[in-house]
């Protein structure tokens, strides 16, 4: 676990009312810097299938653009490659594997965890899946077949 001052900066010093974007950028920066300090050229992230679909939907509805993070991203300014080896694994399968293996789960310390736009999107997709079986698979397929960068 990498200790940072991101929380106090985002919530106290900056007093962000919508902190997620700034926090995410700062966390990525801290992770990239730590990887470089350790001499790493690749970072494996834990984004899974559901994260990708949620991001795709959030980008479409909230930003008016078609986009999502890609399975592999090269960051030329940092000379780092980001890989997402769990991208085709649904969240429930990842959670099940973690429980079966007995891996520890680090709980988020974020004061807005559980009440974010991502959480709303996750719940909305869950409801849409009940009403329109297979919608999540179709959205994921649209990312793969569409013109989403690096898919």
Regions found by a protein language model. Name each.
Residues 12, 67-151:
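ATP/NTP-dependent adenylation/nucleotidyl-transfer catalytic domains that generate, transfer
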Residues 8, 15, 19-93:
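Active-site adenylate/phosphate-handling loop in enzymes that bind or generate adenylated species
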């Amino acid at each position: 676990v990498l200790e940072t001052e991101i929380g106090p900066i985002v919530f106290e010093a900056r007093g962000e009312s919508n902190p997620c974007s700034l926090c995410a950028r700062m966390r990525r920066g801290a992770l990239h810097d730590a990887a470089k300090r350790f001499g790493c050229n690749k970072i494996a992230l834990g984004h899974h299938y559901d994260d990708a679909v949620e991001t795709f939907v959030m980008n479409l509805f909230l930003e008016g653009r078609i986009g999502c993070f890609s399975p592999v991203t090269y960051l030329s300014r940092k000379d780092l490659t980001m890989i997402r080896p769990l991208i085709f694994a649904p969240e429930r399968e990842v959670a099940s594997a973690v429980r079966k293996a007995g891996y520890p789960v680090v709980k988020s310390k974020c004061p807005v965890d559980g009440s974010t736009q991502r959480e709303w999107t996750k719940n909305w997709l869950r409801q849409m899946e009940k009403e329109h079986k297979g919608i999540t698979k179709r959205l994921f397929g649209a990312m793969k077949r569409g013109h989403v960068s690096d898919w």
